Structures are given as structure tokens and as C-alpha cells.
Amino acid sequence: ITAAQVNNGSSDNCSIDTMTLDQTDFTCADVGPNTVTMTVTDVNGNVSTCTSTITVQDNINPTAICQDLTVQLDASGAGSITASQVNNGSFDNCVITTLALDKMNFTCADVGANTVTMTVTDINGNTGTCTSTVTVQDNVAPIALCQDLTVQLDASGAGSITAAQVNNGSSDNCSIDTMTLDQTD
């Protein structure tokens, strides 16, 4: 700021030589009210001072930058991410205090592409958002459990079985889609 911006009609019976401020530059550390002293000096060296309250505001939202991410489900069918994994260099003119995601935990119901929103908040409460595509993958193979089976042949000498008859409690971290046999008759 300049003394001219703070001056509210200073005068002298002769003439004013200089007007100076004890602080002219402000940073994020100065957000809020600041007392600034203006010193007015006339051509004869006489000095007078006054104070003014300068309120510094940070109204600039952080710039949120997201990156896409892939998450693998574990053996229990769960996966999670953190905001720092989604963050791709978000920045602010002051200081970022929090990164938050609207969804961090994923299950088998989320397999595929999911849109996640990250909110970046700065020290003065300003926010910025971005979205990321989080691709959830289930790469855990099912556990196939089989049981022995005795098949009685019919009068024509044929017999058949189903996968359900051979299954002995097979499982998967998500769910079993299909069970097949390589030979059924």
C-alpha cells in the first residue's frame, strides 16, 4: 500500500514534505487487522503521526489438481485411497491445511470407474475442488474347492454332473460369477 491510499486529508499550514508508512507490504502472515502508522512531515521538519487499521484478506481459492488412480481390492474385497495419492500438486497463495476426499473406501460394489472429489482447504478457509477417476479392480482369484462325487450311470450308460454338485464351498473376495466344469458327461 502507499501513504496516499491511507491518507484521509492530512494538511499543514505551510506544506507537507513527506508522508511515509511504517509498513507497506503484506503477506499471508498478515491476514486480519494490522495497525499501520503514517508519519507526515512538513517542509520545516515538524512531524505528526496517525494510525490506520489495514485489514488483509485472502480471498483466493487454492488450485486443486487431481490425478486418476487405480486401487486393487484385497482378499476381503476392500480397498482404500488417501487424499495424498489423488493430489497431483495442488497449491495456494498462502498455505494448504487440508486435503479431503468425498470417498476413500471401496468394495466389490465399486469395481470399475468411480468419480471422487478432492477438496483442498487453505489456512483462511478458502476451498478448491477437483475430480479424479478412481478405477477399482478385483484381481484376487476365487478359491475353488471341489469334492469327490460318485455318479450312477443310467440304463443307456450315461451320467452327468453339475458344477454345483462338485462345489465344496468355493469362495471369492467379491462374489463368484460362474462355476463351470471341463467335463460334465
For each predicted feature, which ranges?
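Proline-threonine-serine-rich low-complexity tracts
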Residues: 1-185
